[in-house]
Amino acid sequence: MYADRDLPGAGGLAVRVIPCLDVDDGRVVKGVNFENLRDAGDPVELAAVYDAEGADELTFLDVTASSSGRATMLEVVRRTAEQVFIPLTVGGGVRTVADVDSLLRAGADKVAVNTAAIACPDLLADMARQFGSQCIVLSVDARTVPVGSAPTPSGWEVTTHGGRRGTGMDAVQWAARGADLGVGEILLNSMDADGTKAGFDLALLRAVRAAVTVPVIASGGAGAVEHFAPAVAAGADAVLAASVFHFRELTIGQVKAALAAEGITVR
């Protein structure tokens, strides 16, 4: 159905399927429903399961507030890198070039930057220059501008604090600026779709796809196997999900089979 379009997975590069784990002080936050896990809260054990199931990459989002939790996260990354050999992206609380350096040295392949870059966009250029664009991901938490707020050109704005706080910055323009500053990838999370399980925000994906040439990861809204191919058709190079995988509502294999059935290349 989609194979005749100029798509990321139409005979070209394989579309990546990426589970995301929220980690707080070294523990997986959102409940996980795997059978036969010794410790469902251990991100390293979960990472190994997803690796075995055919995940193309993994994303860890560190939701810890404390500095002690940051040290714990580095240890989690180290342990994961010893056991899992697919690319690992780590985000959450990354504020400085030194933070990126620590995570990469611990074994992360890519580091996602969010709030700190909003305050200081040149940080992205510094990070890309020092570590290479391929290591730096701009994470954009986008939502429709609420009624009563100042409009943005695209109709979407960048948010912080888990989508609760608007910035007034145009989300599509911000993604484009990040690409111009040297990031290698955009992790595009729709705060409108997040948690709804009603499907990815296709209009947002199309808008960002038209504005950037770097890969775009679609995040937020996955709820059924049918939701993934339309995200690729809208321009996603990779699809990311959390709870549908953790609660065994869908497997990596089912998502890849659904993509392949639409003529989309998967690994």
UniProtKB/Swiss-Prot annotation:
Domain of life of the native organism: Bacteria
Catalyzed chemical reaction(s): 5-[(5-phospho-1-deoxy-D-ribulos-1-ylimino)methylamino]-1-(5-phospho-beta-D-ribosyl)imidazole-4-carboxamide + L-glutamine = D-erythro-1-(imidazol-4-yl)glycerol 3-phosphate + 5-amino-1-(5-phospho-beta-D-ribosyl)imidazole-4-carboxamide + L-glutamate + H(+)
Catalytic residues, chain numbering: 22, 141
GO terms under cellular component: cytoplasm
Subunit architecture: Heterodimer of HisH and HisF.
Family: Belongs to the HisA/HisF family.
Function: IGPS catalyzes the conversion of PRFAR and glutamine to IGP, AICAR and glutamate. The HisF subunit catalyzes the cyclization activity that produces IGP and AICAR from PRFAR using the ammonia provided by the HisH subunit.
A GO MF term: imidazoleglycerol-phosphate synthase activity
Name of the protein: Imidazole glycerol phosphate synthase subunit HisF
Associated pathway: Amino-acid biosynthesis; L-histidine biosynthesis; L-histidine from 5-phospho-alpha-D-ribose 1-diphosphate: step 5/9
Keywords: Amino-acid biosynthesis, Cytoplasm, Histidine biosynthesis, Lyase
Gene: hisF
EC number: 4.3.2.10
GO biological process: L-histidine biosynthetic process
Localization annotation: Cytoplasm
